């Protein structure tokens, strides 16, 4: 897409979905607006709340003397797995690293991009961008890399809802600095969180790959719970390279193109179905079987039906679904073995985790995709396997702790109602526990330095 056409293209794509009114207006005005906006009258909604709530953010300045109204201040901690005094690239070459936001800081990832921008052995940086902060250090690092002669290829998704204007402005900044900009795919939104750094090594090249569940956004990394894997696994890097090559051609990868990554729209849903079938087969053969999934929403009928099949086969299925969930658990003869909980706490639960199996045979993935049809077959999404033993244990701990949350967690019942949970003698707030652990780990790391 030519740069000069980007703004007009966005105007064509944008269309209203509803009209909110702060007070009643006469029917003729509604008729005129309905005709002009080409939107049905049932989508005109009167609300009692102010139409623009942005003023709420300013209230904190007027309520400073009422600290009882505020949460206790929490600051993301430095992970003990990395030293910010050394090259992040060099450290990741030795060992995979899993960052858990907002409990751990995003600083190591930003430093890695800055290191890559200055490293003479780095030849290219490729990224998919969906939402970024207004004053983004990530964008600054990419610009510096391009100005230093690196090949920087960035796919900017212009259809990220509510961020269209910011993404257009950001893409222009990158392009002016010499970055090659890809403006998404016509048929699919690119929602994946993928970054690939390529370095010269001897007579060949080396990949450093980052795959995450959340956006490359410094602000939301302090407000959303997300996971970010940084790995020097060369086969995962080769898969990521094929994903970017396909995107540069305006295409998406197919089953035969990738060996490790699950990539929607063509090879994510079917792979998940296969892994659910494996657990059903294990249960039928008398072997241990387990499925655990943490997502924002569950609406994909193909995956719902397959989870019900697993439950009917006797497989234990644990689902952490923050929002929409179109499966009713604990229905006799259908979902007896499915448990669904939702955690709504101080931070927005946003990470996606897929678990299949038990013990040494367990497969663990982190992903950008929810179990929604829009994610599994209508977007470009990426899920990565986690192979590092420490990272896998960290994900298990996160998942299992959330499953015991009886402070902010609610359990979905067969009648569709969410109820309080009583599991622990002292209620557990999983998010608070993760922050306490992050503080302790950071303190121990500081003591050992």
Describe every region a protein language model picked out.
Residues 1, 23, 148-220, 230, ...:
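PLD/PLD-like phosphodiesterase catalytic module centered on the HKD motif
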Residues 1-7, 12:
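Single conserved hydrophobic/aromatic residue that forms the stacking wall/gate
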Residues 8, 113, 137-147, 307:
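Histidine-anchored nucleotide/phosphate-binding helix
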Residues 15-17, 93-100, 121-128, 151-157, ...:
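Glycine- and acidic
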Residues 31-38:
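Internal gly/pro-rich beta-alpha loop/helix module
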Residues 133-140, 302:
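Active-site core of PLP-dependent enzymes with the aminotransferase class I/II
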């Amino acid at each position: 897409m030519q740069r000069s056409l980007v703004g007009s293209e966005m105007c064509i794509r944008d269309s209203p979905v509803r009209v909110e009114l702060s007070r009643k207006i006469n029917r003729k005005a509604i008729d005129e607006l309905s005709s002009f906006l080409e939107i049905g009258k049932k989508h005109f909604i009167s609300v009692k709340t102010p139409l623009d709530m942005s003023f709420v953010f300013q209230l904190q300045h007027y309520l400073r003397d009422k600290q009882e109204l505020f949460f206790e201040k929490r600051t993301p901690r430095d992970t003990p797995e990395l030293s910010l005094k050394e090259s992040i690239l060099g450290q990741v070459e030795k060992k995979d690293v899993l960052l858990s936001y907002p409990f751990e800081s995003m600083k190591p990832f930003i430093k890695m991009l800055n290191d890559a921008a200055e490293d003479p052995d780095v030849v290219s940086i490729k990224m998919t961008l969906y939402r970024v902060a207004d004053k983004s250090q990530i964008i600054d690092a990419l610009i510096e890399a391009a100005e230093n002669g690196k090949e920087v290829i960035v796919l900017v998704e212009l259809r990220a809802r509510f961020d269209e204007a910011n993404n257009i402005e950001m893409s222009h900044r990158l392009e002016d600095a010499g970055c090659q900009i890809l403006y998404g795919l016509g048929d699919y939104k690119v929602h994946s969180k993928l970054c690939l750094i390529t370095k010269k090594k001897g007579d060949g090249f080396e990949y450093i790959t980052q795959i995450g569940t959340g956006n490359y956004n410094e602000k939301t990394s302090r407000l959303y719970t997300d996971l970010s894997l940084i790995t020097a696994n060369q086969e995962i890097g080769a898969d990521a390279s094929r994903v970017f090559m396909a995107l540069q051609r305006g295409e998406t990868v197919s089953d035969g193109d990738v060996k490790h990554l699950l990539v929607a729209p063509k090879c994510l849903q079917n792979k998940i179905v296969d892994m659910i079938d494996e657990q059903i087969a294990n249960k039928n053969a008398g072997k241990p079987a387990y499925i655990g999934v943490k997502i924002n929403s569950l609406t994909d009928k193909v995956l719902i039906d397959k989870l019900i099949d697993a439950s009917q086969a006797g497989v234990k299925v644990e689902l952490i679904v923050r929002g929409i969930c179109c499966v009713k658990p604990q229905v006799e003869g259908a979902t007896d073995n499915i448990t669904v909980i939702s955690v709504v706490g101080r931070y927005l639960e946003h990470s996606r985790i897929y678990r299949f199996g038990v013990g040494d045979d367990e497969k663990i993935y982190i992903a950008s995709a929810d179990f929604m049809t829009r994610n599994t077959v209508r977007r470009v999404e990426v899920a990565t396997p986690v192979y590092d033993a420490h990272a896998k244990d960290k994900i298990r701990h996160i998942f299992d702790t959330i499953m015991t949350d009886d402070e902010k967690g609610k359990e979905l019942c067969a009648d569709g109602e969410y109820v309080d949970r009583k599991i622990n003698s002292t209620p557990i707030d999983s998010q608070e526990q993760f922050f306490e652990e992050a503080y302790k780990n950071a303190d121990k790391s500081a003591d050992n330095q």
